[in-house]
Amino acid sequence: LYEMLNRFRGKLKMAIATGSPNKFLRIVLDKLKIEEYFDVLQSSDEIGEGKPSPEIYLKAAQKLKVLPSECVVLEDSCNGALSGKRAGCYTIAVPSEYTYKQDFSFVRYIARDLYDAAGHIESLMSLQREHNTIL
């Protein structure tokens, strides 16, 4: 996790968009010491609907001041991935040991792990630079 965060620090705006309440998000951020990496923290407290509603990703994109189509979403659950897709984000599934049997066929990319996801994001960034466009 830390390697991936450091890899993109200063290169991409980063946000957390979690279906958990802010108090739980704060516990995790404090334990892992990762809050400094993120430009936006979006918890379910400000959102009327849970995932798979796109609302949480739309709100995070708005706070980042970017279009949803300019966002890459990493998700480990089918409902979360569907939320990202419905928001119009480029969605990457990173299934966990608990969700790997779920059907992620609707996402743009299924990563084996965070390293694979990071490599894919870097290839998207490279394509964007070459063609001066957002995928």
Predicted segment positions?
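A residue-level structural signature of the nucleotidyltransferase/glycosyltransferase Rossmann-like core
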Residues: 13-14, 109
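Internal catalytic-core helix/loop-beta-alpha segment
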Residues: 5-8, 14
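Asp-based, Mg2+/Mn2+-dependent phosphohydrolase catalytic module
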Residues: 2, 6, 22, 26-135
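Glycine-centered short loops/turns at secondary-structure junctions
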Residues: 11-12, 88
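Hydrophobic beta-strand core positions in alpha/beta domains
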Residues: 15-16, 93
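Conserved phosphate-coupling serine/threonine residues in phosphotransfer and NTP-handling enzymes
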Residues: 18-20
